[in-house]
């Protein structure tokens, strides 16, 4: 996480100053809650998303036979903050999904369990729904809970703990928990833990969530939007009301007139307190290469403030619950020119003079 955040801010831009023009936003179809997975006896971080190709436009991942310069050119056809989006990139399409899976009990005996929840980020008064499912040889197994609690795990000096009550429903133990009852003032990591007796042995399971209390919300989307074509790219202007100044990162996905994913965009800048225009640039060549046309609409609009030196170090904004639809732009309204920048040209020049690895893996001259 730290490495990724360093990368976000090494090229931070200047803060926008103009408020986005007001338009009407529509409510999207609700996404189905994702299943989450359990943890073992030891406390571990949530599992990462399943592997996806970071650059689907380059085809199936594997050993490249390109020389470094060619490989670099292929990887940088599009800018790092606006890239193609495909239906298999669930980490972007379902950014609050968890990825726990059914796992074997420590003692074996054919027992497996899944301890999970319906989300990873919880904000304000939201309710976290968690489930514990236990099976023996694939069949549901009734168990007795010996412990169940939630506690603050970060910051480490704050150890609020509350007991959790689970109820059985269809062979699955279920709980609803409101982190707001902990009375926290800032973004915190919260761990949920259970211990159960399956008739042979006891087993512990654990997962973490990140919670942002109402008092700790750094900024909100106002619901005002605008769209334009600038320098051959689609720009969606998003109005943001900032309470806590600092470095922000805001992401959104773009879908075409057929509701197919087209592109992902990231805005990053230092924002002062007040209302600002976060300009999400969807690169023109991404749209042209997808042969996409409008009206486009955005989804999964979310953001966070980077709080350096804190743990957790991302203060979440409430995701925007609606959508915004652009005008009916034709495909040829956008440029098919490749991304270019001074940094890209410097890297091309550097790689062009480096003959050490010429030929790449599996090739020679």
Locate predicted features.
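Hydrophobic membrane-insertion alpha-helices, especially the h-region
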Residues: 1-12
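Juxtamembrane proline-rich low-complexity "stalk" or linker regions positioned immediately after a signal peptide
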Residues: 11-95
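Aromatic sugar-binding surface patches on proteins
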Residues: 59, 158-180, 272-289
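Short beta-strand elements
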Residues: 95-102, 198-228, 307-365
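Short flexible loop/turn segments that cap and initiate beta-strands
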Residues: 135-163, 248-251
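Short glycine/proline/serine/threonine-rich loop/turn segments at secondary-structure transition edges
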Residues: 181-191, 286-299
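Conserved, compact domain cores that house catalytic/ligand-binding motifs in diverse enzymes
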Residues: 227-277
């Amino acid at each position: 996480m730290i490495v990724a955040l360093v990368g976000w801010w090494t090229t931070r831009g200047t803060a926008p100053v103009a408020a986005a023009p007001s338009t009407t936003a529509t409510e999207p179809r609700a996404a189905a809650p994702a299943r989450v997975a359990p943890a073992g006896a030891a406390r571990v971080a949530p599992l990462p998303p399943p592997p996806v190709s970071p650059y689907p436009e380059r085809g199936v991942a594997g050993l490249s036979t390109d020389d470094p310069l060619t490989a670099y050119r292929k990887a940088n056809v599009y800018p790092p903050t606006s890239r193609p989006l495909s239906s298999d990139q669930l980490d972007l399409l379902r950014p609050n999904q968890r990825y726990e899976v059914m796992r074997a009990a420590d003692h074996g005996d054919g027992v497996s369990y899944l301890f999970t929840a319906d989300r990873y980020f919880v904000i304000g008064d939201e309710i976290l729904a968690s489930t514990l499912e236990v099976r023996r040889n694939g069949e549901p197994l009734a168990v007795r809970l010996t412990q169940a609690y939630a506690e603050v795990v970060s910051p480490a000096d704050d150890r609020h703990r509350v007991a959790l009550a689970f109820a059985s429903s269809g062979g699955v133990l279920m709980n609803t928990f409101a982190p707001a009852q902990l009375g926290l003032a800032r973004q915190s990591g919260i761990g949920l833990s259970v211990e159960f007796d399956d008739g042979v042995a006891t087993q512990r399971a654990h997962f973490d969530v990140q919670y942002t209390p109402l008092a700790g919300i750094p900024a909100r989307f106002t619901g005002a939007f605008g769209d334009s074509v600038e320098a051959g790219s689609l720009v969606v202007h998003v109005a943001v009301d900032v309470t806590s100044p600092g470095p922000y990162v805001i992401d959104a996905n773009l879908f075409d007139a057929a509701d197919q994913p087209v592109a992902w965009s990231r805005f990053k800048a230092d924002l002062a307190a007040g209302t600002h225009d976060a300009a999400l640039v969807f690169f023109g060549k991404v749209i042209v290469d997808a042969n996409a046309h409008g009206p486009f609409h955005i989804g999964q609009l979310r953001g966070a403030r980077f709080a350096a030196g804190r743990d957790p170090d991302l203060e979440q904004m409430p995701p925007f619950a609606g959508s915004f639809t652009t005008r009916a732009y034709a495909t040829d309204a956008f440029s098919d020119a490749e991304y270019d920048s001074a940094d890209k040209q410097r890297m091309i020049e550097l790689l062009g003079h480096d003959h050490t690895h010429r030929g790449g893996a599996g090739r020679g001259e």
